[in-house]
Design a protein with these regions (language model features):
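DEDD superfamily 3′-5′ metal-dependent exonuclease/proofreading module
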Residues: 22, 68, 109-113
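Short gly/ser/thr-rich secondary-structure transition/capping motifs
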Residues: 6-10, 58-61
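BZIP DNA-binding basic region
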Residues: 1-6, 44
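Positively charged, low-complexity intrinsically disordered regions
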Residues: 6, 104-113
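Histidine-centered nuclease catalytic patch
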Residues: 31-73, 85, 89-106
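Short cysteine-rich loop/turn motifs with clustered Cys
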Residues: 13-44, 72-80
Length: 113
């Protein structure tokens, strides 16, 4: 039971950070989502030094400074925009820096299976 409370405090701390930073909004599409659908995206020019899973937000006094510093370097995206951004990056584009690319990827229809 103690580990359940400990784990949920990590989710609570993460949600507090997301609410304070973006109001639970995706920084790409601008839609509001529950915390389970928001993810931290490390831009290509930022060196990823740690994972920002819920467990890294645990702690009796909240997350440590290393976790906060890592989160501050990231972009907060919904799960859909996060996947689209990685597809775009593989193709040499970025949804975050090119609104026309965002529209193109969001409106893309799969024609082959």
């Amino acid at each position: 039971m103690g580990s359940f409370r400990h784990a949920s405090s990590g989710a609570y701390n993460r949600e507090k950070y997301l609410m304070a930073r973006t109001g639970m909004t995706c920084e790409c599409c601008g839609e509001t989502f529950p915390r389970e659908l928001l993810e931290f995206h490390h831009p290509p020019n930022v060196k990823k030094t740690m994972s920002l899973k819920v467990r890294s937000w645990r702690g009796i006094r909240g997350p440590n400074q290393k976790t906060l510093d890592e989160a501050d370097q990231c972009v907060i995206l919904c799960s859909n925009c996060h996947r689209l951004e990685h597809v775009a990056l593989k193709r040499g584009e970025s949804l975050l820096h090119d609104p026309s690319a965002y529209r193109r990827y969001r409106n893309h229809r799969v024609t082959r299976y």
